[in-house]
Structures are given as C-alpha cells and as structure tokens.
Amino acid sequence: MKRFIKSIGIIAAILVILVIFYLFMPRVEGPAVSGNNGNALQEGDIAPDFTATKVDGSTFKLSDHSDECVLINFWATWCGPCVGEMPAFQKLNDDDIDGLEIICIDCQEDEKTVDSFVKENGYTFNIAYDTKGEICAKYPTRGIPYTLVVNKGKIVNIYVGAVDADTQYKEYKSAIDACLGE
C-alpha cells in the first residue's frame, strides 16, 4: 500500500511540474501573431496599409510614408526576444536616418501594459497599440518578433525571431541602407 501511495505522489508531482511548465512557457505564437500560413506575406508583396495609434496619442498610417523606407516590427512585452531587440530600434532611431520611419506594433496587449513598458525603458521611437489584433491579422506570421522592411510600399526584407540587439541592429541597418540606396 505504501508503494502505491508513493507512486501516486510521484505521478502527481510530475503532473504539477508539467502544468507549471506549460503555464509559464514563453509563447511566441498566439492569436495576435498566427494566421493562415497560406496568406503569409513574402518579400516583393505590397505591404497592407494600416493606421495605428501610437503611445504618444498620434496616429501612424503606413500609406502616408509611401516614399520612405519603413521598418515595421510586431512584438509584445511578454516576448523575451522581442524585448531583447528593442535597443536595436532605439539605436536606429537615435541614428536619425533621413528617409527612415520605424513603427513597432504591440500585439494585443492593453495600453497600460505597453505604456508602462515604454516609460520604464525610456524608448523614444514610434510604438503603437494593436489591442484588437487587427493590424497583426493583416501581417500573418508564425511568431514574434516579426519585422519587415518596406520600401515605397513593397516588402523588401522579412525577419522572424531575433538573436540579440547588436546583431539585429546590424542586420536591420544593412537592409535599411540597401533600401535607401546607401
């Protein structure tokens, strides 16, 4: 009988560990970022237009920047790789590159969470809300961070995932330089 109770205890402990692991496992996919993979965007496609409200209260409309190079990033505060590459966007913003617009769109989080994150980190580049996932739905992907470089309305580079801020900065800067013909 003691052996049976001990076995039940071990099984219960394993189940608890599995449940805890599942609950706290980072989620890179979710309703905000997943979509019909048959509709995934590709380099050369026209970037779907969108209008987003930025954390400063102003709006960003992609089609208003059709003559510029636009770096669009989809991210969330709970996504470790997303948070890890944010310094790359700040550095690009600080470089003050003529002809470049940066817009980072938070996927389906409440505005207070995003505002708090931006304030805590002192980010000054364009960050926008997509609380209902409407913009993210236009840009289906398997995961975030998901970054696109758009030149004159056309997608020229797509990045899914991140390595570290320095590596991402170099990759994005190279793509932006090519986009701007530098």
Report each predicted region and the residues it spans.
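N-terminal targeting signals for export/organelle localization
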Residues: 1-46, 182
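A short beta-strand-turn-helix
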Residues: 49-70
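Conserved hydrophobic/aromatic "anchor" residues
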Residues: 50, 60, 74-75, 117, ...
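Short pre-active-site segment immediately N-terminal to redox-active cysteine/selenocysteine motifs
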Residues: 68-70, 74-78, 143
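Hydrophobic beta-strand anchors of alpha/beta hydrolase catalytic cores
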Residues: 71-72, 102, 147
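Conserved redox-active cysteine motifs that mediate thiol-disulfide chemistry
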Residues: 74-91
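Conserved segment of the thioredoxin-like fold in thiol-based oxidoreductases
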Residues: 84, 92-132, 141-144
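Thiol/disulfide oxidoreductase modules built on the thioredoxin-like
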Residues: 116-124, 131-180
